[in-house]
Regions:
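C-terminal segments of enzyme domains that contribute to small-molecule binding surfaces
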Residues: 2-8, 71-75, 79-80, 97, ...
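Conserved protein kinase catalytic core
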Residues: 117-118, 136
Length: 168
């Protein structure tokens, strides 16, 4: 569902899927082909939130406080992305937390359950793991391609949901 807040309503691009029980609130922009899955919350109630093209915000994830999400990004189930910048072609693993001022550069993976502390910047092609999160190694070309493939699979899945989902 989309909600206006303080006179600001979400801006939604073409071919966007928003699950019925997801909440997209206030000053939010969703790029073409993006998807917001069941139970997710994108709260643009205090600052603008940007979600790029063909990005997916998976079940029960939360975006808040000026988060900027690039193109082709996967934000995994139950992740929290707060006041940070996630560049293009990044996978934020399930249950991970990325805090204010952090920057995750393109072609990177933040592993499941990682805690990215505030104001940390990570270089491109990083495998970022742990609590607190650190770079463990550079990603391979195959791993980078798998990030792209995951985002594309969610674009396809969102199209299927838009065509075939029936509310009972």
């Amino acid at each position: 569902m989309k909600y206006e807040f303080n006179g600001k309503a979400p801006e939604v691009g073409e071919n966007v899927f928003i699950a019925d029980n997801a909440a997209v609130i206030g000053d939010v922009s969703l790029g073409d082909g993006s998807s917001v899955w069941f139970g997710a919350a994108i709260r643009g109630d205090d600052m603008h939130i940007e979600v790029g093209k063909r990005s997916n915000i998976q079940d029960n994830a939360t975006l808040h406080s000026g988060a900027v999400i690039g193109d082709g990004v996967t934000v995994g189930h139950n992740a929290i992305v707060h006041g940070c910048r996630i560049c293009d072609n990044v996978l934020i693993g399930m249950g991970s937390i990325v805090l204010d001022g952090a920057v995750i550069a393109e072609d990177s993976i933040v592993g499941a359950g990682a805690l990215v502390t505030g104001n940390k910047t990570f270089p491109p092609k990083s495998l970022i793991l742990g609590s607190p999160a650190t770079v463990r190694r550079e990603l391979t070309d195959e791993e980078i391609e798998s990030i792209r493939n995951n985002a594309e699979e969610y674009v396809k899945l969102s199209i299927e949901y838009k065509k075939t989902q029936v509310t009972l």
